[in-house]
């Protein structure tokens, strides 16, 4: 296969304010839409043979604005289920749990529908996605595979790709509306690019023309 192209969705109101967002299905902000459109030149020269996308609206809209055609909706790409910490910021959690760390402690129990996930459970999902990617790559030759998803999940996916434990995801910071790439060197998994984005000063160029109404 070629490389694995990781794309984090554009900004939402909750990502801007630092709230943990998993199942809450928020749209992109105006800035988030500009970030998504600005991905186009960052992936224009890539030969992408398959796009896998989280079912969340923010991920699907990012893929659409980035020009990624015929994405495959992949439920395992959903964000870490934050359980009782959905919509809560890290600062707020630290008021009652000063030493709390998502990567080692997991989350507080949530509702029956969204009980929360342990780090191990998220790692298992990432492993399933990597298995799906490797299977698909067998018929794609040297084409890249794009994955449009969420910060914490993509960080776990990266850790597992590199042979690290789930907690290794803490080593990788990932901004909204960014592109990262995973590949190989001498047969070993490596990061070939990380957290790429257009400078904020150029994002206005990615705004839609006033005569156009966004879908």
Feature-to-residue mapping (PLM):
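Internal catalytic-core helix/loop-beta-alpha segment
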Residues: 100-137
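Loop-to-helix element that buttresses phosphate recognition and phosphoryl-transfer chemistry
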Residues: 8-61, 112-127
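Glycine-rich phosphate-binding loop signature in dinucleotide/nucleotide-binding domains
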Residues: 44-47, 133-143
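Phosphate-coordination/substrate-recognition cap region in phosphate-metabolizing enzymes
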Residues: 38-101
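Active-site signature of alpha/beta-hydrolase-fold catalytic machinery across serine-
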Residues: 65, 156, 160
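Beta-strand elements within well-structured catalytic alpha/beta cores of enzymes
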Residues: 3-7, 52, 140-149
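Short active-site segment of divalent metal-dependent hydrolases/proteases
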Residues: 12, 153-154
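Acidic, low-complexity terminal tails and accessory targeting/binding regions
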Residues: 1-2, 81-92, 139-143, 159-215
